[in-house]
Design a protein with these regions (language model features):
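Beta-strand secondary-structure signal
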Residues: 62-64, 131-135, 149-151
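Positively charged n-region of N-terminal signal peptides that target proteins for export
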Residues: 1-4
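Bacterial signal peptide processing site
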Residues: 22-24
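Short, solvent-exposed, Trp/other aromatic-anchored flexible loops in extracytoplasmic proteins
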Residues: 90-144
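Classical Sec-dependent N-terminal signal peptides that target proteins to the secretory pathway
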Residues: 10-11
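Short beta-strand elements
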Residues: 144-163
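Short, surface-exposed binding/anchoring microloops in extracellular/periplasmic proteins
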Residues: 34-89
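C-terminal motif of bacterial Sec signal peptides marking the signal peptidase cleavage site
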Residues: 16-20
Length: 163
């Protein structure tokens, strides 16, 4: 009888230790937020932009840029920048430069690209609404520079779960 009690107490102690090692559903649950954005003016339109945020990764998809008029056909270089205005401060989320070194032109339309990493560390998600902008700076073959800014409409796609 003493052996059975010792075995049962040992088994109970082992089970108690291993219960703390299991992954609870609360620990496995990750917060996921998905935002879409778009915008347009008389020169160009941006569609299909997406921001994906979870506890392990932040990804910013710039979407597609479509030129609405063919006024920007002699572009030799451009800079595309997404940023959030926070007060008077411009917080850049993604920016890149393209320049043709052969004397030809580059096309501004098409896929804008994506970036992953700590994109949103400087801003809060509440700052995205009404504060996300796209800036296009171009230089044509004659060296003339132009700058265009577009405020983007941000929509949260995910809904917060009530627990």
């Amino acid at each position: 009888m003493k052996k059975i009690v010792v075995i049962l107490l040992s088994a109970l102690a082992c089970c108690t230790m291993f219960i703390g090692c299991s992954n609870s559903s609360a620990n496995q649950e990750q917060h996921l937020s998905v935002y879409s954005f778009s915008g347009e003016d008389e020169q160009f339109a941006i569609s299909n932009g997406v921001i994906v945020l979870n506890s392990t990764e932040e990804t910013f998809y710039g979407g597609d840029l479509k030129e609405k008029q063919d006024k920007l056909s002699d572009i030799a270089a451009y800079t595309k920048t997404f940023y959030v205005m926070s007060g008077n401060e411009k917080k850049i989320l993604m920016s890149f430069v393209v320049e043709d070194m052969t004397g030809g032109t580059v096309n501004i339309s098409g896929d804008i690209g994506k970036i992953s990493g700590d994109i949103m560390t400087k801003i809060g998600t509440d700052e995205l609404q009404n504060n996300l902008f796209f800036e296009l700076k171009t230089t044509d073959l004659n060296g003339e520079e132009n700058e265009f800014q577009l405020q983007l409409t941000v929509t949260e796609v995910t809904e917060k779960a009530d627990n």
